[in-house]
Every structure is written in C-alpha cells, then in structure tokens.
Curated annotation (Swiss-Prot):
EC nos: 3.4.23.36
GO cellular component, one term: plasma membrane
Gene this protein is translated from: lspA
Main location: membrane
Membrane-spanning parts: 9-29, 49-69, 71-91, 100-120, 135-155
Function field: This protein specifically catalyzes the removal of signal peptides from prolipoproteins.
Membrane topology value: Multi-pass membrane protein
Name of the protein this chain belongs to: Lipoprotein signal peptidase
Species annotation: Burkholderia lata (strain ATCC 17760 / DSM 23089 / LMG 22485 / NCIMB 9086 / R18194 / 383)
Location(s) in or outside the cell: Cell inner membrane
Catalytic activity of the protein: Release of signal peptides from bacterial membrane prolipoproteins. Hydrolyzes -Xaa-Yaa-Zaa-|-(S,diacylglyceryl)Cys-, in which Xaa is hydrophobic (preferably Leu), and Yaa (Ala or Ser) and Zaa (Gly or Ala) have small, neutral side chains
Family to which the UniProt record says this protein belongs: Belongs to the peptidase A8 family.
NCBIfam families xref list: lspA
C-alpha cells in the first residue's frame, strides 16, 4: 500500500511532531502578543462573557499549587518533559492510529507550550477569561486548550475503540 500524507506510516513521528510544533507556535505567539499589549492584571472586555486578561499561573490547572513556594515550577517542568518522552514513544509506536496520534500531538504541543513558559518566565501566561456575570472560569491559554481538546479526542478514540470491539 502506498504511503500518503493522510495516513502516516507506522512509526512516522514527523507529521505528529509537526502538529505539536504548530500548537506550540500559535501558543507562544499568542502569549507574546498578550505580553506586548497588556500589563499584569489588565483586562479587556470583548463580549459579555469573554475577556482578555494577563495573569500568571505558577501552579497547574486552575491555579492548583500556585502558592506552593516555587518548587512546583520544576516539578511541573519535569512532569512536562516526562510526558513528552512517553508521548513520543507512543507516537512512534502507534503513529498509524490517526485520531489517537492527533490527540497525543495536541497534548504534547500544549504541554511543551506551558513548559516553555515555566522555563522562560517562571510561570505560565494565561489570558483567556470566560465568565458568567461575576463568576469567572479560571483563565487559561491556547496550550491548555490544546491539552483539553487532545484529552477529549483521546477519550472519544478510546470509547470508539471499546465499542468497536463488542
């Protein structure tokens, strides 16, 4: 069977790493734009439910461990690097499984986008702020979005696989 761009050969890492690189690029460019446009804590209302803000997250998702004293920067950086190694192994091994690999590529790009922030700035830059009245969902960024979409696709792929085996 001829190899095509639509279906990478088993073990073909390049297409999936390319997707991860695109995620990283969009994530980092968006953060640079926010850093050049906003001062810390600034907020710009775009709609009745969405603002652009500039906040720093020294913790994990939803600010978990953000006040832990500094060790979490290196712990989450190490976790991101470990996840990178595991994901690259899985992509190498299962590169022919398109949805599975796409989900991992998105998670990888998002994880590395946030690792770059931790290494360069000492914290993750968040700027997307959705709210309903006075209640605000924790601010997040494009890397977080890619991780979330990747995780949802991963769950969907697994459910599809389980249903297909019945």
């Amino acid at each position: 069977m001829a190899k095509t761009l639509s279906k990478p050969a088993s073990g073909a890492l390049a297409p999936w790493l390319g997707i991860s690189l695109i995620v990283i690029l969009f994530d980092q460019l968006s953060k640079i734009a926010i850093l050049k446009t906003f001062v810390y804590g600034a907020q710009h209302e775009l709609t009745s439910f969405f603002n652009l803000v500039l906040v720093y997250n020294r913790g994990a998702a939803f600010g978990f461990l953000s006040t832990a004293g500094g060790w979490q920067r290196w712990a989450f950086t190490a976790l991101g690097i470990a996840a990178t190694l595991v994901i690259c192994f899985l992509l190498k091994r299962h590169g022919q499984q398109r949805l599975f690999s796409l989900s991992l590529a998105m998670i990888l790009g998002g994880a590395l986008g946030n690792v770059i922030d931790r290494l360069v700035y000492g914290h993750v830059i968040d700027f997307l702020d959705f709210h309903l009245g006075a209640w605000h969902f924790p601010a997040f960024n494009l890397a977080d979005s890619a991780i979330t979409v990747g995780a949802v696709l991963l769950i969907y792929d697994e459910l599809r696989r389980v249903r297909g085996s019945r």
